[in-house]
Design a protein with these regions (language model features):
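Short catalytic/metal-binding and nucleic-acid-binding patches
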Residues: 1-190
């Protein structure tokens, strides 16, 4: 079984002060491009994901030399830098000074930050130890936009892998996990 050969992890990470950064396509693209880079160069195997306005969820495994924590660290570091640059260089960003002040204030007095802190700290990958737990997490990730009242069906949300699990092509490449027969029809609602 696929589950015997891979270690699956889940992680959720949010912007500092839950700032709604991902309401503009330019910022969503920075995040998506960064995930793609990690898929191509860091061994990130993405199984489920969802990007909300101020946080992201990933269910993933890895291949190659980088650990789950290494991949997450690099993804967060790269997206932080690129998203701050995108905000600074966006002439039509009406919230620019407000957002940059929040990220600058959060970055002050932090040893591991030079200027800004974009993501909240202390979010570590959690190992998903069984198929049941893995699919509970995947269902949770996919239902995030439904629970938030953004869409009525999970697969209608663009920045999620829910559509991939229904046989449609999503924004990012996803390695779909097959739900074991024993879990068929067991969708967890939140």
């Amino acid at each position: 079984s696929f589950f015997l050969n891979a270690r699956f992890s889940s992680v959720s990470f949010a912007t500092v002060s839950w700032v709604d950064v991902f309401t503009r396509p330019v910022y969503n693209e920075v995040f998506i491009d960064s995930v793609r880079y990690c898929q191509l160069n860091k061994g990130l195997c993405l199984h489920a994901w969802c990007l909300m306005s101020n946080h992201a969820h990933l269910v993933f495994s890895r291949s190659g030399q980088y650990s789950h924590s290494d991949i997450l660290r690099d993804l967060k570091k790269f997206t932080s830098k690129k998203l701050i640059e995108a905000i600074e260089n966006n002439p039509s960003e009406s919230r620019k000074e407000w957002m940059l002040n929040i990220f600058r204030n959060a970055g002050q007095n932090k040893i591991n930050n030079k200027d800004f802190q974009f993501w909240q700290q202390d979010n570590h990958p959690i190992e998903l130890f069984s198929p049941s737990v893995t699919f509970q997490k995947i269902d949770y990730v996919h239902n995030n936009p439904v629970v938030a009242g953004i869409v009525s069906e999970a697969d209608h949300y663009l920045h999620s892998s829910a559509r991939d699990y229904l046989g449609n092509k999503g924004v990012l490449d996803v390695e779909i996990l097959e739900r074991p027969m024993s879990l068929e029809g067991h969708v967890i609602s939140y």
